[in-house]
Amino acid sequence: MSVTLALPSKGRLKEKTLAVLEKAGYKVVLPDDDRNYRARVEGEDDLDILFLSASEIARELGYGSVDLGVTGEDLARETLAHADERVAIEAQLGFGHADVVVAVPEVWRDVTTMADLDDVAADFRQRHGRRLRIATKYWRLTQQFFSQKHGIQVYRIVESLGATEGAPAAGSADMIVDITSTGSTLRANRLKVLEDGIILRSQACLVSARRSHTSRRVEEIAARIRAGLEI
């Protein structure tokens, strides 16, 4: 029975993933046609490569339609309800670093922690006649962090379809939850990250579908990739 490994289909994530695999001794033979999203690995007839977007990889792992995949931890945890029951992180790959953070306008000088934000959220409806609005593409992670971890209930998530960091200035939200690598875009939009507002420190990971997690072949591939990372 063959194992399907899903890889990012383009950009630096694809390049860095192929380099990690080669370091582990897996030489991916790319197709001649760029529209062909399947590839093979030299000398590994039972290992199939499938190229997908990082978000598609997270979803397909959750469905169990691929055995292994390389995607961001943020995407796995945001895309999949009860992610730990559906997938397992086999290795952190050391690239694609980014943090999912809670950011508020710099002019909110008295708001530096989630506890401060809880006070603001409770007071916001009375003062403004509406709930605090949070723009984000990460509604699942936001709900878990606000409601379950910090007990903040009085807020409303505004789906972000464009540049999330611009939502407060545009008036469509009061604050944001977004992903950032350097923080420069947040600063350019006069936003600040709360002191305890890092929801997740994400990076590219090798992830297995839970249904495949105990497969001897999947374990062997994951172990070989982990060993390659230590070279």
From Swiss-Prot:
Gene3D superfamilies to which the protein is assigned, alphabetical: Periplasmic binding protein-like II
Function per UniProt: Catalyzes the condensation of ATP and 5-phosphoribose 1-diphosphate to form N'-(5'-phosphoribosyl)-ATP (PR-ATP). Has a crucial role in the pathway because the rate of histidine biosynthesis seems to be controlled primarily by regulation of HisG enzymatic activity.
Chief location: cytoplasm
Keywords from the named record: Amino-acid biosynthesis, ATP-binding, Cytoplasm, Glycosyltransferase, Histidine biosynthesis, Nucleotide-binding, Transferase
Domain notes: Lacks the C-terminal regulatory region which is replaced by HisZ.
Compartments where located: Cytoplasm
Keyword Transferase appears in the UniProt entry: yes
Protein's name according to its UniProt entry: ATP phosphoribosyltransferase
Enzyme Commission number(s) of this protein: 2.4.2.17
Keyword Nucleotide-binding included in the entry's annotation: yes
GO BP term, example: L-histidine biosynthetic process
Source organism, top-level taxon: Bacteria
Family affiliation: Belongs to the ATP phosphoribosyltransferase family. Short subfamily.
Catalytic activity: 1-(5-phospho-beta-D-ribosyl)-ATP + diphosphate = 5-phospho-alpha-D-ribose 1-diphosphate + ATP
Species this chain originates from: Brucella canis (strain ATCC 23365 / NCTC 10854 / RM-666)
Gene Ontology annotations for the cellular component aspect, listed alphabetically: cytoplasm
